[in-house]
């Protein structure tokens, strides 16, 4: 009889192996066998837990998204109640060290590419996009009229994605300070127009 919690431990081990495999070989070079080899377990166990490569990528992205959502919630709870602080918390969560590590960044890029072709991944991306927009819009709405808050939220979401994408593609370690400064300057600029 398996140990209590072994399923969760094994899944986490395989998700970590998937992140590292995508980092080293890209999505095309990531197979159930290569993940199994990295995790030092049989391919059959990977197949048992995830079914196929699509299931493995979906589970890995659910893990990455859960980390992002938890970081966002944690940072928003810790922030002061004013809109600027809440918005900065959302930005900081998106540029958190967990989200800007090499393996996670390469997995995000693979996920975005695959989400254009796979409905289950497209749905995950849509949920992520809506959650970010909703958080930003709610916070901007505390300081701006509704239409302006929506525009500001769309602008900041695009800026977060753009800064993140440029950082991911630069081939250098992600410059968190520069990304935070640019995004926070945008927040200050938008909110200053209403102060």
UniProtKB/Swiss-Prot annotation:
It comes from the Bacteria. Pathway: Amine and polyamine biosynthesis; betaine biosynthesis via choline pathway [regulation]. The keyword Transcription regulation applies. Coiled coil: none annotated. Residues 31-50 bind DNA. Gene3D superfamilies: Tetracycline Repressor, domain 2. Signal peptide: none annotated. Residues 8-68 form the HTH tetR-type domain. Keywords: DNA-binding, Repressor, Transcription, Transcription regulation. One of its GO terms (biological process) is glycine betaine biosynthetic process from choline. GO terms for molecular function: DNA-binding transcription factor activity; transcription cis-regulatory region binding. InterPro entries: BetI_C, DNA-bd_HTH_TetR-type_CS, Homeodomain-like_sf, HTH-type_TetR-like_transc_reg, HTH_TetR, Tet_transcr_reg_TetR-rel_C_sf, Tscrpt_rep_BetI. Repressor involved in the biosynthesis of the osmoprotectant glycine betaine. It represses transcription of the choline transporter BetT and the genes of BetAB involved in the synthesis of glycine betaine. HAMAP family: HTH_type_BetI. This is HTH-type transcriptional regulator BetI. It comes from Paraburkholderia xenovorans (strain LB400).
């Amino acid at each position: 009889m398996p140990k209590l919690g072994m399923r969760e431990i094994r899944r986490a081990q395989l998700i970590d192996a998937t992140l590292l495999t995508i980092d080293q070989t890209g999505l095309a070079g990531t197979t159930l066998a290569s993940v199994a080899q990295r995790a030092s377990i049989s391919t059959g166990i990977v197949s048992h837990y995830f079914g196929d490569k699509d299931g493995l990528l979906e589970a890995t992205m659910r893990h990455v998204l859960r980390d992002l959502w938890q970081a966002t919630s944690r940072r928003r709870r810790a922030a002061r109640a004013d809109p600027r602080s809440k918005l900065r918390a959302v930005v900081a969560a998106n540029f958190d060290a967990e989200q800007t590590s090499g393996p996670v960044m390469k997995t995000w890029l693979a996920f975005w590419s695959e989400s254009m072709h796979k409905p289950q991944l497209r749905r995950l991306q849509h949920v992520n996009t809506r959650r970010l927009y909703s958080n930003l819009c709610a916070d901007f709405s505390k300081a701006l009229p509704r239409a302006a808050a929506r525009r500001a939220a769309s602008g900041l979401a695009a800026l977060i994605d753009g800064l993140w994408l440029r950082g991911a593609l630069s081939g250098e370690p992600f410059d968190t300070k520069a990304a935070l400064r640019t995004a926070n300057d945008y927040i200050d600029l938008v909110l200053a127009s209403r102060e």
